[in-house]
Amino acid sequence: MLSLKSRGSWNVLRWIQVPRRTAVIPAKPSPMRRKRRRIKNVSSKDLDLRGIDPQDSRALEFKVKQLQEFTRNLKEQFKLADSNTKKLEAEEELAKSIPEDDDKRADELFGKLEAPAFEKPLPQPNLSTLILSAENQQLKKLIPVEIKERINDDGFLLARLIDKDNQNWNDIISKLYTTEKRLSDISMPIISSGILRKVKNLSYENIEKLDIMLLETKNGDITCFNRLMYETLLLNLSNLRPPTSGEEDKVTMKMRQLLERYDKSKEISPDVPSKMTQFSLNCCLKYSTKSVSFENMEYFLSKFKNDYGITPNRENYTTVIQFYVKFGVSKQAWDVFDTMKFLSSSHAPDVTTYNSVLHLCNRERDYAKAIDLYEEMLDRQLQPSIQTLNIMAKTMARASADNVISEGKADSLRLLGWKYIHTLESTFDHTKHETHFYHTLEAMMALAAYDGDVGFARALYYKYTTRKYKEVVKYWKGKFDSQKIWQTALDPQLFNLLLLAYANFRPNKLPILLGYEKGIKLRRNILNSVDYAGRYDLDDEIKVQLPMLPISDMNQAWQILAESRALWQFNLEFGGYYDLRDTPEGFDTTRLQEMVSKSATQDELQFNILHQVSQWKFQLVNHSILNPKSLTTFLTIPIKNGDRIEFMLRLKEFTFQQNDLESRIEKLYKGLKLVESRVEPNSHERDLAINQIEMDENVKWFASMKHKIVAKNYIYELMMKAASAFKDSAISKDAWQSRGEYRKTKLFQQMDSKRRIESDTQFAALMVQFFARQNMLTDALAIVMSTRKFIDWKYHMVKGLHEGLVKLEDEKSISILLDIVNKKSSIELLDEKIRDFQL
């Protein structure tokens, strides 16, 4: 959680401690320091105490030292005497056993007796020997000796295994595969403990090599392929990334191949115990979830249940639910969840399972269901996790956005969301759970954004972004790359929530947090902990500043518009690294003419231009920020704050019409091709001069596409909302005509028919709403009547029109409208006839 202390004692979530350093400075040598006296050559006469004053401590101390020195000398003399005695005894014994005339042999013996006094010490191992010995001991723990001998490269093995968190088994398996014997003649216990239980993160190619080597150990007998072998291969397969669209899914094919191998082994030896386990099933389900393959999920579930008698356990069921949630199949997810609750206690949902279905509630904005599940967890004595509380807070925030879904209780839902945040704050220590910090921050920003609490949302965004930037810079390695650093620090999800807070800002609305004591304290501490001017960061080595107004809170619409525009540019430009208005380097009229000349057809020219624009977007614009979701929120800000001019400027600068692109390319292509075909030189020069202005304009227009998004249905719907808000018929007319042109393009025609009908329905409803607000009731009713065969009109879509007709007491029009709204489908009419017939 965020720290709630005041500015003076506030600390960031991650502590950066600088240890104190001490220095020891030796004292300056003093000329007055008395030198220590060394006592030498002490005799027995020196030990005489006569003439010594008993009160003189220095004299007595000196005599004690003389006595110690005399005693030490005596000990050395005794040792020397003992040594000489031993030498004499050895000499006499040698003289008795060896002839006296063998002087040479005697000298050698006496030399050996003398040798111990001058013998050199035993040779000590050098540093290289110690390192090699340590490496051998370490390798014995990391890999079996038999496999080490096969590879025969200790340095290679140690370099790839010494870091237990990042072991490189791919290189080891590849090198082992190139050896002569591979895994042959190595006992199964050694292979199991040294390879199968340790190998991880293998590539697909190395999984195939490992499979071949394991089969070789069994001489190709698939009946001897044991359980651990299957589990190891399936586990490494499940950790691989699914292929991109259009590529062959080799991983799923390999998984199915392993199951088919096991089926064949069962046919050969039906009495062998089952080698398929819950673990194997979970590996298959894990990969199916990542690949988002409904077909594979159903195949593995039915295969393990029908052929192997393995029904999913709690972990398997949770994986299946997570898959259904990710796939968007809510009904199946709820069915599996309900099934788990009615099975044995070992299958009962745990906190992870509840979190999975809570994600579904958040997506569907079903706050009532989420609250019921949370209370159910408490009744079953399951401790909600940090993730649980974060999801609950987000669900309350999202549900409060729609007045219909929230049933008019938007403020109550946000207040309940803050309750979950306070529970999280009091229950968990954020320093021990910092990995969940981002999700908690996201939940808090969501609550503030939907409440329109700009001050709190921008403070959280500033704190997170500046902290993230400093962390990235601090641990950055290699050449400093400002673009990549800012791309990492600028989070698109949090930025969209900040834009949403700007859009929902109302100067006369009191934030929810200011309605109770805990909220007041939290909001005050967060706002006071932020210094937008950077005055308190002067001593910080890493400087960072965001283009935000140096005020803690906002109360004017112009402040919202100015800051949102500045932050939008800042995010798109990688923190100001590029300028959006600059033309990309190397792109001018000559380059554009060259592209036209090299294009054989108009479609080829369009493809080449769009390809160039996509490269610019990737290189020069922060494309993670420039997306339809953020753009919609960005365009909504001036609508909610009542600034028509700003809305039109933003719309023109960051969107383009598909038909404008096609018509411009067509004119450019035909115009230049026509000029190239001219024969008369004077006419040719005149046409080039005339087209130079158009070419310059085309260069600017195509260059600006790098920071623009093509206008689709959501843009036209937003234009209609703006027309209603500003009561501007010109905007509505422009939206109507532009969308009409858009419906003729391939982009719209290639859409699914269901989506086309949905978009037409939504746009028509907005048109009716606009005309009703403008009191153009006849035009609104005409739209409803002309589209009744294609659009299923509901009352909430024509509510404004109906209320306007009621005020005018136009009974005929009201009757026509209600007949259209209350009309029944052919299926409903058929059901009524069947019921009448039964009666």
UniProtKB/Swiss-Prot annotation:
Residues 1-59 form a transit peptide. It is found in: Mitochondrion. GO terms for biological process: mRNA processing; RNA splicing. Keywords: Mitochondrion, mRNA processing, mRNA splicing, Repeat, Transit peptide. The keyword Repeat applies. One of its GO terms (cellular component) is mitochondrion. Disulfide bonds: none annotated. The keyword Repeat applies. PPR repeats lie at residues 313-347, 350-384. Regulates mitochondrial small subunit maturation by controlling 15S rRNA 5'-end processing. Localizes to the 5' precursor of the 15S rRNA in a position that is subsequently occupied by mS47 in the mature yeast mtSSU. Uses structure and sequence-specific RNA recognition, binding to a single-stranded region of the precursor and specifically recognizing bases -6 to -1. The exchange of Ccm1 for mS47 is coupled to the irreversible removal of precursor rRNA that is accompanied by conformational changes of the mitoribosomal proteins uS5m and mS26. Involved in mitochondrial-nuclear incompatibility, a major determinant in reproductive isolation between species, through hybrid incompatibility of Ccm1 and its interacting partner 15S rRNA between yeast species. Belongs to the CCM1 family. Binds to mitochondrial small subunit 15S rRNA. This is Mitochondrial 15S rRNA processing factor CCM1. The gene is CCM1.
